[in-house]
Structures are given as structure tokens and as C-alpha cells.
């Protein structure tokens, strides 16, 4: 975190520097002009994590400033959603005078939504007992007069859900509303409004598509659910069980009937497609019946492994969302041999940082 860089008045300048840096870094691939999708300059993060500092009777949130090399008190936090900032104030007022709730509390995580739900996770360096549960239940009841809130307590090998451990986000994407179950302690897009722009860009990039779509690393179905409208069928893979469970919920609640989720890694799926190995999880699924002309990938920061990259290269069109320009550039060295970049986008998920989220559409040469 660099608090000094978080100045909304300099946001446009910082974003322009990112655009220039990105265009220069990828100039060798003769990309089209970068499509730039800006963030809100403040209150854009839907989740935030704070450490807790105990100072006598005082108790406050803090973060570590890497530039100043010191902890910084955070009574409010400019990047966090308005809902998180409101909850920060209300929550700390209740925690301070309560011995049970504050005892050995070392971290608080917030997960909020545009739909108005918020999840608060309290993390402790002690085991949670009946007194904690009673006080946390009373806390939830009091906060519920102002917020649509759920509370989770965590300690070593212990997790207490007072109600549920997820929120349901509602995103307006073009003329459609999509609902997404987001589970505590699982990956979700941090900047909801930029996430909407990413979905709309991906939908536009795949308009008038032929055949089916294959998606690797689908998470909770964020993209595959929105993109299903552009394809006959969608086949998606994800390894993390909580994400797969959330994806199945999201498929049902959004009424998507042409999307199949398989729980397996991209590497294993590559082996299955190459018929190197058979997998019980694929029983009843006829991979050969899918006519996938388009593949969508949103890999982790490490990028795409060599075997999967070879698989990806076999498709006419590749839609690649990247959270790491360095590994995207490395992957493009190979993909550029057979495909040409026809669209290139910068999504500013993380203002005031060096982080750049990018989107690339590649089409066979």
C-alpha cells in the first residue's frame, strides 16, 4: 500500500501512464490501440483487509505503508466501498468496549457488494467460545438495524458462521442483471464496476460467435455466465471446490441452461483433450460433441503452462484476460506465431498501483 499515491486528483494522469507503459511493453506484437476502462477514483474496492492494533483502551484498523515502511492508522479507507467505510465506523464502535469481541482480535476482513450486502470476518489468535458466539450474535443483531450484514469468526482450525459465509452480488451488464454468489475467503473481482466493464467488453468481443466456448480457470462463473448468451454451449473448468460450488449456484440462479462446469485443473483438462489420460470426472461428458471455435482463459498470475498453451493455440479465437502483463507477454511470444492480436484492453482494477488487468482477443492468422 502507498497512501501518498491515493489522490483522486491525479487519477487520470496515473491511468494515462499505465496506458503508455502497456502500449510500449507490447509494441512488438503490433497490437491495436489500447481500449482503456477507468475505475472510479475512490470507493471502488468491494473488499478490504485490515490488521488491528490494540493500544490500551483504544483499538483501530491499520495497514502497512511500504513506502513509509510503517503502519498507518485507517479509520477510513479511500479505495474501499462506501459500504465498507460505513461499516468500519459502526463496527469499531461496538468492538472497542467489548472484552470478548476484541480479545486477541488481529484482523478484520470486509466483503461488500453493489447489491448492499456486506460480510465481516473477525480473525483471532485464540479459540472462540460460547461467550464470543453470544456477543457476536448480539453484535450482528445491532448492526442489522443499519446493514444487511453477516459475521464470521475465525481462529486456528475454527470457523463460526452466524448465518452464512457468502454474499450475493448483483451486476447490471448491458441490459441484463446477473447474480453472483461470492464466498468468504475465495477469489472475487475486487472492483465491481470495472468488472462490469470487463464483462461488457468480453461480450462485445465475442458477438456473432459461431459454435461453442471453452473456458479455463472459470472461478465462480463470472465470465462464462455472462458470455453464454453468445454461444450455443459453454464448457468451463475450475479446480477450487468453493468456486465450483458457487458457479453451480450462479448457473442456477441466473437460469443459464447451456453451461457445463467441470471441476478439474487446466493442466488435467489439456491431457483429457489430448486423450493422454481418462478422468472419472468427465464420465458422461462427450468432449468430442463440443465445437469450440473460441477459448476463454483467465489464468493466475503465473500465466498459462506450456501444455495448456499448446491447447489454447488450437482454437480459432482466443480471449485472454490477464492479471499479470509480464506472463501475458511471455505467453504471447508463442501465441503470436499462429494468432494476431485484434483487440487490446486495459482495465484499471487497482488504481494507484502498478497493477494492470488486461484483455486480449487473438484471431488465427
From Swiss-Prot:
It is an enzyme of class 2 (transferase). S-adenosyl-L-methionine binds at residues 189, 217, 222, 238, 298. GO terms for biological process: tRNA methylation. This is tRNA/tmRNA (uracil-C(5))-methyltransferase. GO terms for cellular component: cytosol. The keyword Transit peptide does not apply. Transmembrane segments: none annotated. Disulfide bonds: none annotated. It catalyses: uridine(54) in tRNA + S-adenosyl-L-methionine = 5-methyluridine(54) in tRNA + S-adenosyl-L-homocysteine + H(+); uridine(341) in tmRNA + S-adenosyl-L-methionine = 5-methyluridine(341) in tmRNA + S-adenosyl-L-homocysteine + H(+). It comes from the Bacteria. Its EC number is 2.1.1.-, 2.1.1.35. Dual-specificity methyltransferase that catalyzes the formation of 5-methyluridine at position 54 (m5U54) in all tRNAs, and that of position 341 (m5U341) in tmRNA (transfer-mRNA). The active site is at 323 (nucleophile), 357 (proton acceptor). The gene is trmA. Belongs to the class I-like SAM-binding methyltransferase superfamily. RNA M5U methyltransferase family. TrmA subfamily. Gene3D superfamilies: 2.40.50.1070, Vaccinia Virus protein VP39. It comes from Shewanella baltica (strain OS155 / ATCC BAA-1091). The keyword Methyltransferase applies. GO terms for molecular function: rRNA binding; tRNA (uracil(54)-C5)-methyltransferase activity, S-adenosyl methionine-dependent; tRNA binding. Keywords: Methyltransferase, S-adenosyl-L-methionine, Transferase, tRNA processing.
